[in-house]
Amino acid sequence: MIIIHSSKFVNAELEAEVGPIPPCMLPIGNKKMLELQVGNFRKYFPNEKIIVTLPKYYQLTINEQMVINQLAVSVQRVCDTISFAESMLHVLNIEIDCPTEQIRILQGNRLLNDIPTSDDCIATVDQSRQSDWYDRYQRQDNESRWLGYYCFSSKADLVKALALSTKSFPEAITHYRDSIAMSEVQPTDWYNCSHFRSYFDARSSITTQRSFNALIIKSGIVTKTSNDDIKIQAEIYWFSHLPPKLRRFTPQFIDSGRLQDGITTYYCLEFLPLLPLNELYVHGRNPIWFWRNTFDLIKDYFGHAASQEYLYALDATDMDECRDSLYCKKTLSRLKAYQKSSQIDLHSAIFYQGIKLGSIYDITQECIAKMLKLPKRPVIMHGDLCFSNMLFDTRGRRLKLIDPRGLDCHDNFSIFGDVSYDLAKLAHSVVGMYDFIIAGRFEIIASHEADHAEYIIHFDMDERLERIQAEFLQFRFVDGIEVIDIMPAVVLLFLSMLPLHADRPDRQQAMLINAFRLYKEYVHIHSVEHSSIDNQLVHSEQVYNNILES
């Protein structure tokens, strides 16, 4: 039997980052730490029962309950005010169906990738490991070397030792050793996520990137490369040409150049121990006021990015042509690529929740037309202003933006664009639930009617997330543009991203069906009369035909 002890909440400094959650729910690598912990245990002990302890009154979100169910682990509720020893005694007295099994215990704020397999052992570490300074300060000398993983061959002897220990786990170990000898083992691949510094050490070692990006984090510096050389050069251009007054919204740009192969372009930024908003949105428990404050900071960024003192160099940029490129040509060319790889029919009728929406092409045409009707708003455009590219500094109440686009409609290096695109990227994280798709927190539900098949996408939304989305939809980020006005662009974003996730067909399907959901909920029901967009539809059809013929 394996017990992951996570019945207390994270400490105050971590709670300020992610909200009041138990340590096993901390986000790492766009997953909950529990997912990594259980995955590692399954590698070594595939048939052992796994129990995770949680605070007695901690209410699981729908999303968290889904993770628990998928991992097939049992949950035991334990009062968060009792000691580690009392918690273990409580669990062992309840779990009466495994009287002779080995007991393996992992503290919930630890992540072990090489789990010891020996019996009756205590995992220990070298006292010189700097990330453990906090634990050495708080614990006794003997205990300070304990990593947080223990194995006991006798449940009966362990229960007896815990009962005699008077709330002290080290004392329980002493009593257990009176009966059974315990060895010390030293794992080499592990992380301690009990406090701020060590948690971010773990995060920097477990990075996430898509197939076309690569990140190296070392000595406080992030080095980024990519298979797409123009993409990296464009990001370098954006960082190096950003006006000084806007640089407070980004990490420090340190260096750029080519690697030793003389071919691969790279650039370096300072590494900031900050959480991206996507992980807070999917895995955190941050309250509504936190997100309201975050939206205020984003609005502040939009205000500075639209400052007229930065836009004097925009004379040569044709905003109409650039908007047409972003919303029309880009979407249609990406759809063409997706059509070729998937053999999907772009002209077949689509049904969502029993409503006929038209074809993918019809949806695309309408959304393009609606976006091209919006007023032009030139700004210094980030170009990929989604939650995963926004780091939040809780102490300084600042946003730090990463991974900009840096290209205009002609694929020339540029820092300029239209604010509607940045706002659409933001909405595709909040309302579009993009980060839930990337984290695998969705379900595709299929139904088959007499004349067609129908698919819907379901997200595990709780009341808190619904309130955040409601706040977002009502928030005025840019004067003269409502969030609902840019929802057609969000639909286009999901359609245009389909070929970029070719390595994950499940995500591609989710993004396509999610585009239908967004169109049905935020565009279809708000549609204006067709006569007002006929000219744009004709224009889009001409572009579409040109792309297909190319």
Regions found by a protein language model. Give the residues of each.
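Conserved beta-loop-beta/alpha segment of the NTase-like Rossmann-fold superfamily
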Residues: Q59-R136
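ATP-binding glycine-rich loop module of kinase domains
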Residues: R210-H241, E270, L277-G284
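ATP/Mg2+ or Mg2+-diphosphate-binding catalytic cores
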Residues: H458-S550
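N-terminal nucleotide-binding beta1-loop-alpha1 segment
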Residues: M1-I21, M25
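Active-site acidic catalytic loop and adjacent metal/ATP-binding pocket
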Residues: Q365-G417
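Conserved core of the sugar-phosphate nucleotidyltransferase
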Residues: R110-V185
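Active-site activation/catalytic loop segments of kinase-like enzymes and analogous catalytic loops
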Residues: L407-F475, V491-D506
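Conserved kinase catalytic-core helix
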Residues: N278-S342, Q353, G358-L374, M381, ...
